[in-house]
């Protein structure tokens, strides 16, 4: 499960020696209550473990309840900055020593932060799990925040901010989020600005860590060539004595809706491509409409050549380099987005074509054959996600985060197959209002092209 808009910090190397897998048979059934161990430690850490003996590797994924919702408003980016520093040295190991230890066994450890959580992940051979867990626990429990690395990471973040300012897709995304959320905490920039990153000092990083990094609500998922009970015991061995509670996170205000069309254009005259994003407020992940909207979104901009948007705007009309839609839902709210990258001369035509497809979805029932194709896509893609330990760990972490229940994967196909064309029409009419949406465009505007010509 990816929660970070800022790249995780990872150290890895090429694969090392091959080790024979256990003679036990690989797990082929969908994960569920019968083969996923779930255990809560006395300090509030939840451990989920699933065995898979088809390869000698183990994947670990998890998160802590600290994110950019916990930042001071004037220090946006503090959560991801703190996450970037976790692998930069601890009270027991230097940055170089961590790298050498991890690289010597061909393993990887990564961190990232999003709005709600700070995530971590590891990958290693099963025989090296003890070492990886020891280093992971050291990084999470005893980071040193060495001053020289604080400045090195600051430089990397400043470079990322500069690169983002030169990227039409990212700038359109920033503008869209500002339109949708305004001053709401969910609209905060994960990476932060040049000003906020310049203002973040080492003592702010240390204070943020010491205030919010606590085991309460932490989740650790282990999947691979290790017994479930053994995996849980190993996690308890390195994290079980971690104590303390973080301050309660204040309740978020209600996300404001849209009362009309909001539009923002970000001129980037030196670019050859413009990026368009249309956005509508959507539902939280646990809302009864979510699965209906998932199917509707598959029709609109996922299935085949990116759904109807791709078929119309890209393939049939030839106006876009890409066109697709996405449904993003969190605990409090959601966004329904339609995006396209186009030749700047096609901006207005592409916007009209995208809106036409959205309106068609909200005004006409999806034909039975198209609906069945999209259902088969959704149900057929699930086994592909579960082919790897990474995929299983990601889904289990997502299930735990949203409280979907360990049987969710086993229920999923029935949920999707039970949806109808009326469900798709209903949810499209409810959320994809023709007169209430946000529009963000970044790139050369038509006037820029005229001047250039």
Locations of regions flagged by a protein language model:
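Generic structural signal for individual residues within well-ordered alpha-helical segments
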Residues: 99, 130, 151, 198, ...
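A short, flexible N-terminal coil/short beta segment enriched in small residues
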Residues: 152-161, 165
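M16 family metallopeptidases and their MPP-like homologs
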Residues: 48-50, 55-84, 93-140, 158, ...
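Conserved short beta-strand edge segments in small beta-sheet-based binding/regulatory domains
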Residues: 146-152, 248, 364-366
């Amino acid at each position: 499960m990816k929660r970070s808009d800022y790249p995780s910090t990872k150290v890895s190397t090429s694969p090392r020696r091959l080790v024979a897998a256990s003679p036990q048979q690989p797990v082929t059934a969908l994960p569920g209550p019968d083969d996923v161990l779930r255990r809560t430690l006395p300090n509030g850490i939840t451990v989920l473990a699933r065995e898979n003996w088809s390869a000698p590797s183990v994947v670990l994924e998890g998160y802590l309840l600290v994110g950019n919702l916990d930042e001071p408003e004037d220090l946006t980016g503090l959560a991801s900055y703190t996450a970037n520093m976790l692998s930069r040295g601890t009270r027991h190991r230097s940055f170089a020593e961590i790298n050498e230890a991890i690289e010597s066994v061909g393993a990887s450890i990564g961190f990232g932060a999003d709005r709600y959580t700070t995530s971590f992940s590891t990958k290693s051979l099963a025989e090296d799990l003890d070492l990886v867990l020891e280093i992971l626990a050291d990084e999470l429990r005893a980071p040193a925040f060495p001053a020289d690395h604080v400045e090195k990471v600051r430089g990397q973040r400043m470079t990322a901010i500069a690169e983002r300012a030169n990227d039409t897709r990212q700038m359109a995304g920033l503008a869209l989020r500002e339109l949708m959320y305004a001053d709401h905490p969910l609209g905060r920039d994960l990476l932060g600005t040049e000003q906020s990153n310049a203002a973040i000092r080492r003592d702010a990083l240390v204070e943020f860590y010491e205030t919010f990094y606590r085991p309460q609500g932490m989740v650790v998922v282990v999947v691979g060539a290790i017994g479930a009970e053994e995996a849980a015991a190993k996690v308890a061995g390195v994290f079980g004595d971690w104590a303390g509670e973080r301050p309660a996170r204040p309740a978020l205000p209600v996300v404001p809706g849209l009362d009309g069309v909001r539009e923002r254009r970000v001129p980037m005259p030196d670019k050859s491509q413009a990026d368009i994003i249309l956005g509508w407020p959507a539902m939280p992940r646990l809302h009864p409409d979510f699965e209906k909207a998932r199917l509707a979104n598959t029709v609109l901009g996922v299935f085949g050549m990116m759904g109807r948007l791709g078929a119309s705007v890209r393939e049939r009309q030839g106006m876009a380099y890409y066109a697709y839609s996405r449904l993003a839902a969190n605990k409090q709210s959601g966004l329904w987005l339609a995006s396209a990258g186009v030749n700047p001369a096609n901006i207005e035509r592409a916007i009209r074509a995208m809106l036409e497809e959205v309106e068609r979805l909200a005004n006409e029932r999806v034909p039975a054959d198209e609906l069945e194709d999209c259902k088969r896509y959704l149900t057929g893609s699930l086994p592909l996600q579960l082919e790897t330990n990474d995929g299983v760990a990601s889904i289990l972490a997502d299930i735990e985060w949203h409280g979907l229940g360990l049987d969710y994967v086993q229920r999923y196909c029935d949920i999707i197959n039970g949806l109808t064309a009326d469900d798709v029409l209903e949810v499209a009419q409810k959320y994809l209002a023709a007169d209430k949406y946000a529009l963000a465009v970044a790139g050369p505007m038509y006037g820029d092209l005229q001047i250039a010509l």
